[in-house]
């Protein structure tokens, strides 16, 4: 059975991975009964959600230009055809994966082929990309001896501690029947604790911590076979994270298989990724198919910054219908809103990067369990976190790019896409509300509408009964109509 190396102290109540219970093998069938309303994917009790299978075409570009990407060798319709270890197949079956998703159909043969080749994959959240790279990592590790079981062979990097913990949970569930599998976490620890030596076959972590552990020789990387970057665009585009990723890669074996996955790949990041993972096979969705279906996009006019806060308080009753995330631009804003709303008797929590790791873990776990309904966050949560109960996202501050050389304020389209993607997950219905309090914010909202060729509906805050009616109807609807179409290059 798979085990997790206790590299970090888990908070009471458990991390996602800690809360995953292994099924009783005596009652476990090889093919579990299909879950209602679920096509593929890990059920909620195993830390997963339904897969979202939108209508899209998967485009494949092979590094070998003489090869035919439409050859059946580069596609698969069932997991059994991949020649997987039966114990991995059993893990997939217990996660309720009955057949590969569209992305997995094309990605898995390329990932698992020998000799290993690099892969750059662009696929929106909820399409099975995490399961694809985890399955590849499980298939690549050698667990034939006790020494190899304690030797890092696959490294998965994520931009945030929260996403790393989520991926670690997927590895543990998928590998739960693999004897000798040990999983380690290389994520920031509380200030008073020191990371222990990693003795595991698969490591999930963040770039900064991994780099530090390699320098301290608590992580020996010389036997690594696979390097995965999830949300790769975010890591390669951010100066700090990008530099850390480059430094980590420079310390790894030169023949390592590099796998990059992300929901978005702006052109300049794609060029960077091509250098980070040279001669890679590429899998992409057509740009116009980068959709977030089922999200009703609204905006509210606010007189000024103070009116923004009053509007948020006015919305509080609606925020707790399901779970909600309020996105702000700065840590100071998150802390100030939390302080004021708590003083007024509202139950909210904030999640920002400077909090101690154990506190961040506890907050995320409370939010997943529904004990905390309203979360105030900076962009630390905009990437990849799957919480199926989120029904509303508030853009208290419209996301913007800081480009001193460009006149005026510029909306950050990719962050907007990732933010509103926290709701309406896996085909569910959700609401996104943006606050607009001045002309510059109005211009940024228009930039978003133009880029994504979508209409964001104005709601008149003078009539709060109407506001409540619109939002409640949207959340209760089985389907939301507006399409969030892909934007321009």
From Swiss-Prot:
The keyword Transport applies. It is a peripheral membrane protein. CDD domains: DEADc_DDX19_DDX25 (cd17963), SF2_C_DEAD (cd18787). It catalyses: ATP + H2O = ADP + phosphate + H(+). GO terms for molecular function: ATP binding; ATP hydrolysis activity; inositol hexakisphosphate binding; RNA binding; RNA helicase activity. Signal peptide: none annotated. Pfam families: DEAD, Helicase_C. Associates with the nuclear pore complex. This is ATP-dependent RNA helicase dbp5. It comes from Neosartorya fischeri (strain ATCC 1020 / DSM 3700 / CBS 544.65 / FGSC A1164 / JCM 1740 / NRRL 181 / WB 181).
């Amino acid at each position: 059975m798979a085990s997790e190396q206790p590299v970090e102290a888990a908070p009471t109540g458990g991390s996602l991975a800690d809360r995953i219970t292994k099924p009783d093998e005596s009652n476990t069938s090889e093919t579990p009964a299909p879950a209602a309303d679920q096509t593929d994917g890990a059920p909620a009790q195993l830390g997963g959600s339904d897969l979202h299978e939108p209508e899209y075409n998967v485009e494949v570009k092979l590094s070998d230009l003489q090869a035919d990407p439409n050859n059946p060798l580069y596609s698969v319709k069932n997991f059994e055809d991949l020649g997987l270890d039966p114990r991995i197949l059993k893990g997939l079956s217990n996660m309720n994966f009955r057949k590969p998703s569209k992305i997995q159909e094309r990605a898995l043969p390329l990932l698992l082929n020998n000799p290993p080749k690099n892969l750059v994959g662009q696929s929106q959240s909820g399409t099975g990309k995490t399961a694809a790279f985890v399955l590849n990592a499980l298939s690549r590790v050698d667990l034939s001896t006790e020494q190899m079981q304690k030797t890092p062979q696959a490294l998965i990097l994520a931009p945030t501690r929260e996403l790393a913990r989520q991926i670690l949970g997927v590895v543990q569930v998928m590998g739960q029947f693999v004897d000798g599998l040990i999983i380690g976490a290389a994520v920031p620890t509380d200030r008073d604790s020191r990371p222990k030596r990693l003795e595991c076959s698969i490591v999930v972590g963040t770039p900064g911590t991994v780099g530090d552990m390699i320098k301290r020789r608590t992580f020996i990387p010389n036997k690594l076979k696979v390097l995965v970057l999830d949300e790769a665009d975010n890591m390669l585009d951010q100066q700090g994270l990008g530099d850390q990723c480059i430094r980590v890669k420079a310390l790894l074996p030169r023949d390592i298989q590099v796998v990059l996955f992300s929901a978005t790949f702006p052109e300049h990041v794609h060029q960077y990724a091509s250098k980070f993972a040279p001669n890679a096979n590429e899998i992409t969705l057509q740009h116009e198919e980068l959709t977030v279906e089922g999200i009703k996009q609204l905006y509210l006019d606010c007189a000024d910054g103070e009116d923004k806060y009053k509007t948020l308080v006015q919305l509080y009753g609606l925020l707790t219908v399901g779970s909600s995330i309020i996105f702000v631009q700065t840590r100071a804003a998150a802390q100030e809103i939390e302080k004021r709303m708590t003083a007024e008797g509202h139950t909210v929590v904030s999640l920002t990067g400077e909090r101690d790791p154990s506190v961040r873990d506890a907050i995320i776990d409370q939010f997943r369990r529904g004990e905390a309904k309203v979360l105030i966050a900076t962009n630390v949560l905009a990437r990849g976190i799957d919480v199926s109960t989120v029904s509303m996202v508030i853009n208290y501050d419209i996301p913007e790019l800081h480009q001193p050389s460009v006149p005026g304020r510029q909306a950050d389209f990719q962050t907007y896409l990732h933010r509103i993607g926290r709701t309406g997950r896996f085909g569910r219905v959700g609401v996104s509300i943006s606050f607009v309090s001045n002309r510059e914010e109005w211009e940024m909202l228009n930039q978003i509408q133009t880029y994504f060729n979508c209409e964001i509906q104005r709601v008149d805050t003078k009539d709060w009964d109407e506001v409540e009616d619109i939002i409640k109807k949207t959340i209760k609807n089985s389907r939301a109509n507006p399409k969030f179409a892909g934007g321009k290059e």
